[in-house]
Amino acid sequence: MEGRTLEEVQEEVFKRHGVLVPKKELEDLAKALEEAGLLLTEKVEARLKEEEEKLKRERPMRLAGLSYPEGEREARAFLEAFRASYPGEGEEARVLLMPHLEPSRVPEVYGAALAALEKTPPPERIYLVGVAHRPLKEKAAALPVPFQTPFGPALPDLPALQALDALLPFELFNTPLAFREEHSLELPLFFLKGRFPEARVLPLLVARRSPELGEALKVVLRDFPGLLVLAVDLSHVGPRFGDTPLTRTLAEEARRRDLGFLERLAEGEPEAALAFLGANPTRIDGVEVVASLLPLLRERKGKVLAHRLDLEAPTLSAVGAGTLVL
């Protein structure tokens, strides 16, 4: 409403469309928007401020009971079942690319990530880099608080986070509300915490490519070594994303793009992986993360363990997911 009163909105609608909307309808609309948090009023601002203050203390589980079990015993059984869904063996990872897609859609891809984690010695810390699905004030952000999981809180590595923040030309600890419902950290962290219960975590989100982040992480990793995890998904195709309903041709193109991207990363050639995508017509959402972490991916060779393009039947759309170890 841009600071205008309901009467002014009523007048503007009448001028533009010749329709006099009853004030009661406008009041009901404003109330509904306020309750949904879509209209910034004093009440909504106060609620957001309260949420932000809570997030500065801890990040609660948002998807427990929906995407994974809330209880530890059930969560352990969940991990075992997902590992069983992948029949192969893993390889030790210094860098791991894994999904953040709803686990039930790609169980064998998460299972491949668990197989890799089985072969990886427990790290002191995990650099978990996800994709921001909400706007950030800066190119990237971190939330230096415990993240709750069924296996107990994943504690932040504050010294490493502070060292990273000191090297960046922007404030790293920005936009805490962007972490409130961010599944690109919560879902991978469930699997990582289950496998490495003692590891500290650096929870990072990337909104736009940030070469500065990659360079700073390269420096910080020398003093604070750990496992680097890219929590990214691959192609997004179909009506949900602006395409026609999924066809064999579209699915083949999405798979070709996904595997070409992953295989070039596995050859230690991240620039070639990005160049292969061109304008990214199948909307691989890991592009900004990979572009930000180039210094950490160059000349690191590895192996693609799993890939799947998963159909979302109600919308005839599909999303790709993969697991890659470097």
Swiss-Prot record:
Protein name according to UniProt: MEMO1 family protein TTHA0924
NCBIfam families noted in UniProt: AmmeMemoSam_B
Family: Belongs to the MEMO1 family.
InterPro entries, A to Z: MEMO1_fam
Domain of life: Bacteria
Listed Gene3D superfamilies: LigB-like
